[in-house]
């Protein structure tokens, strides 16, 4: 695990090997939430334990769930009627999913709940979701119209609302709330982005026997439904797998990199990234439960980022090694993640010699030889791991990557995984705090 006083020192190396991909963050958080709202005891195997998972677990315990951890599994006795023991506040840490999902669920209770979180969470948009909840009757008091903190409570009124699709979590939050509401609710999504991630939420609801009608991007929930307990094993995280895959894809080794625990039928959005790379010429074998990467060259091109917008940082790194220029577009939502990922990855790769330029909704990237440099994560786990891949495949020089504690958000054992694949990534303990001015 990466601690707050450490950076990473990265040297050019030749990765290869075989490894199990860590559990999916998106599935883990949904599994915890749904188990906590179900009748009976649910068992979640192979759960990801990270700061976001702990945020969700703490919130669910406040709603009356009883949680036992046994090894890498969770036994959760749910509270199917959390409306009558709703907590006075939720601290969302730095979790965008917890912020959006629990904000919406709070409107099922008539008791006001304070929604707050870390300073960095204030940059995550919430206004479009609040606007739709207000139209359904939610009572909201806030100091600013765009961020935490605020208080919110219901009840909502039966009806129909239109919600922004600029971030798929808004629609997912409303779908989960409508699924559990005691009255009918329906909504239409305007210009849905990140569609695979919304579909992932609907897949969960369908698997838990929640009934709803869907007409393209309009959904109707009849009301009065509840969740039953379940057993579930969390699959590997395709988003995290993208970084491990990139170690192998860009390697000069003659040996493949094999990533296990990646079921091919899973609905995670970033799974589509691997199909894209195959289309661009990468030598990738997608099997039923694993993916095999062979070092290979590939083309750049015009790439619509919407299906896998979280992959923008690592795809920017990969495109530096493509045979021709690339334009990543339709990625406006990347500006509102843990960092402005468009600006952040361009700025840091430019330090390494990359020809990476922000555009209105993405990046323009020309093939470049990268070199080692002092770079910064911008406190964003995906920026950090993408830069680690860039450092491993730099043509010369070491890379000092600062502020790497953020990696714990989705991949606490990233350094161990990189080393397992023979990537020269190691902890660097500075004798002094690595200030932003030094790293940037």
Swiss-Prot record:
Pathway given in the UniProt record? Metabolic intermediate biosynthesis; chorismate biosynthesis; chorismate from D-erythrose 4-phosphate and phosphoenolpyruvate: step 6/7
The entry marks the following residues as binding phosphoenolpyruvate, namely 25, 96, 124, 169, 341, 382, 409
Q: Where is the active site?
A: 310
What is known about its subunit structure?
A: Monomer.
Where 3-phosphoshikimate is bound, by residue?
25-26, 30, 168-169, 310, 337
Which family does this protein fall into?
Belongs to the EPSP synthase family.
What function does the entry list?
A: Catalyzes the transfer of the enolpyruvyl moiety of phosphoenolpyruvate (PEP) to the 5-hydroxyl of shikimate-3-phosphate (S3P) to produce enolpyruvyl shikimate-3-phosphate and inorganic phosphate.
**Keyword Disulfide bond belongs to the record:** no
Q: According to its UniProt record, where is this protein located?
A: Cytoplasm
InterPro entries found in the cross-reference section: Enolpyruvate_Tfrase_dom (IPR001986), Enolpyruvate_Tfrase_sf (IPR036968), EPSP_synthase (IPR006264), EPSP_synthase_CS (IPR023193), RNA3'P_cycl/enolpyr_Trfase_a/b (IPR013792)
Under the heading PANTHER family, the entry gives:
AROM/DEHYDROQUINATE SYNTHASE (PTHR21090), PENTAFUNCTIONAL AROM POLYPEPTIDE (PTHR21090:SF5)
The EC designation for this entry is: 2.5.1.19
The enzyme class is transferase
GO BP, sorted A to Z = amino acid biosynthetic process; aromatic amino acid family biosynthetic process; chorismate biosynthetic process
The alphabetized UniProt keywords are:
Amino-acid biosynthesis, Aromatic amino acid biosynthesis, Cytoplasm, Transferase
- Molecular function via GO: 3-phosphoshikimate 1-carboxyvinyltransferase activity
Q: Know the name of this protein?
A: 3-phosphoshikimate 1-carboxyvinyltransferase
Q: Which reaction does it catalyse?
A: 3-phosphoshikimate + phosphoenolpyruvate = 5-O-(1-carboxyvinyl)-3-phosphoshikimate + phosphate
Q: What is the lineage of its organism?
A: Bacteria, Pseudomonadati, Chlamydiota, Chlamydiia, Chlamydiales
């Amino acid at each position: 695990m990466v601690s707050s006083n450490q950076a990473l020192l990265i040297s050019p190396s030749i990765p290869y090997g075989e490894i199990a991909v860590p559990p999916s963050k998106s599935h883990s958080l949904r599994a915890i939430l749904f188990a906590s709202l179900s009748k009976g005891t649910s068992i979640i195997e192979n759960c990801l334990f990270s700061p976001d998972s702990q945020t969700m677990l703490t919130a669910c315990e406040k709603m009356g769930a009883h949680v036992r951890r046994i090894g890498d599994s969770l036994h959760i006795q749910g509270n199917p009627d959390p409306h009558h023991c709703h907590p006075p506040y939720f601290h969302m840490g730095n979790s965008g999913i917890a912020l959006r999902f629990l904000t919406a669920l709070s409107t099922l209770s008539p008791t006001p709940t304070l929604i707050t979180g870390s300073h960095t969470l204030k940059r995550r948009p919430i206004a479009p979701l609040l606007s739709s909840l207000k139209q359904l009757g939610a009572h909201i008091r806030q100091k600013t119209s765009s961020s935490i903190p605020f208080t919110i409570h219901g009840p909502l009124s039966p009806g129909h609302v239109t919600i922004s699709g600029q971030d798929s979590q808004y629609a997912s939050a409303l779908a989960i709330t409508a699924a559990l509401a005691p009255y009918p609710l329906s909504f239409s999504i305007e210009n849905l982005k990140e569609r695979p991630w919304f579909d992932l939420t609907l897949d969960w609801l369908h698997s838990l026997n929640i009934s709803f009608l869907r007409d393209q991007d309009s959904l109707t929930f009849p009301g009065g439904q509840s969740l039953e307990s379940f057993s579930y094993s969390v699959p590997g995280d395709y988003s995290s797998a993208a970084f491990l895959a990139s170690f192998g894809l860009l390697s000069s080794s003659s040996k493949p990199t094999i990533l296990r625990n990646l079921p091919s039928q899973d609905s995670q959005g970033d799974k589509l990234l691997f199909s894209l790379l195959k289309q661009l010429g990468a030598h990738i074998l997608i099997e039923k439960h694993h993916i095999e990467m062979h070092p290979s060259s590939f083309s750049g091109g015009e790439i619509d980022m919407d299906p896998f917008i979280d992959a923008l940082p690592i795809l920017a790194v990969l495109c530096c090694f493509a045979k021709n220029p690339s334009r990543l577009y339709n990625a406006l939502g990347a500006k509102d993640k843990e960092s402005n990922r468009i600006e952040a990855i361009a700025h840091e790769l430019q330090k390494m010699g990359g020809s990476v330029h922000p555009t209105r909704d993405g990046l323009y990237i020309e093939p470049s030889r990268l070199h080692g440099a002092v770079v910064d994560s911008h406190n964003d786990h995906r920026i950090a791991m993408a830069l680690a891949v860039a450092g491993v495949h730099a043509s010369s020089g070491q890379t000092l990557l600062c502020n790497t504690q953020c990696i714990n958000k989705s991949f606490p054992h990233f350094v161990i995984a990189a080393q397992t694949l023979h990537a020269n990534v190691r902890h660097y303990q500075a004798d002094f705090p690595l200030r932003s001015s030094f790293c940037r």
